[in-house]
């Protein structure tokens, strides 16, 4: 059977050339983070956001700005077109619709007056109907109700 043995290189057994390691050179990072001496209470959200600017590369910032400006320009032009179209439609509606509505109302009035005149004409024909040998409307009504003529009440 084969046996494996670990052979260490002499190079790794000697200490490396360089400054001596001293544990006092290193400090606890937790204590540095918790120190509030660097905290500015006057720092605003925009200051913090502006400080993050260096974390994003200039090409990425340019790409985001291009997308932002393209989107805002599209929204502005769309809203501008929609406003102008709404103005044109409403003014056209007022210039055409109001006179049309007035003319339509007048036409309805004329039609109602003509119908009323025809009804009066028919009503007068019915009341005065009858020729020679025919009884008038009053006589027909009196005969229908079976009444005699009017008598004075004493």
From Swiss-Prot:
Protein's membrane topology: Single-pass type II membrane protein
List all topological domains (Cytoplasmic).
1-84
Where is the chain membrane-spanning? Answer: 85-105
Biased-composition ranges, Acidic residues, are 19-31
Q: Which GO terms describe its cellular component?
A: mitochondrial outer membrane translocase complex
The Gene Ontology biological process terms listed for this entry are: intracellular protein transport; protein import into mitochondrial matrix
One Pfam family, please name it: Tom22
- InterPro entries recorded for this chain? Tom22 (IPR005683), Tom22_fungi (IPR020951)
Q: Which residues form a coiled coil?
A: none
Keywords on record: Membrane, Mitochondrion, Mitochondrion outer membrane, Protein transport, Receptor, Translocation, Transmembrane, Transmembrane helix, Transport
Mitochondrial intermembrane-side segments = 106-154
Please tell me where this protein is predominantly located: mitochondrion
State the superkingdom: Eukaryota
| Cellular localisation | Mitochondrion outer membrane
Annotated region described as Disordered, given as residue ranges? 1-31
Q: Domain annotation text?
A: Its cytoplasmic domain associates with the cytoplasmic domains of tom20 and tom70. Its intermembrane space domain provides a trans binding site for presequences and the single membrane anchor is required for a stable interaction between the GIP complex proteins.
Function, as annotated, reads:
Central component of the receptor complex responsible for the recognition and translocation of cytosolically synthesized mitochondrial preproteins. Together with tom20 functions as the transit peptide receptor at the surface of the mitochondrion outer membrane and facilitates the movement of preproteins into the translocation pore. Docks tom20 and tom70 for interaction with the general TOM40 import pore (GIP) complex. May regulate the TOM machinery organization, stability and channel gating.
Assembly and binders: Forms part of the preprotein translocase complex of the outer mitochondrial membrane (TOM complex) which consists of at least 8 different proteins (tom5, tom6, tom7, tom20, tom22, tom37, tom40 and tom70). Interacts with tom20 and tom70.
Family per UniProt?
Answer: Belongs to the Tom22 family.
Protein name as catalogued: Mitochondrial import receptor subunit tom22
- The source organism is Neurospora crassa (strain ATCC 24698 / 74-OR23-1A / CBS 708.71 / DSM 1257 / FGSC 987)
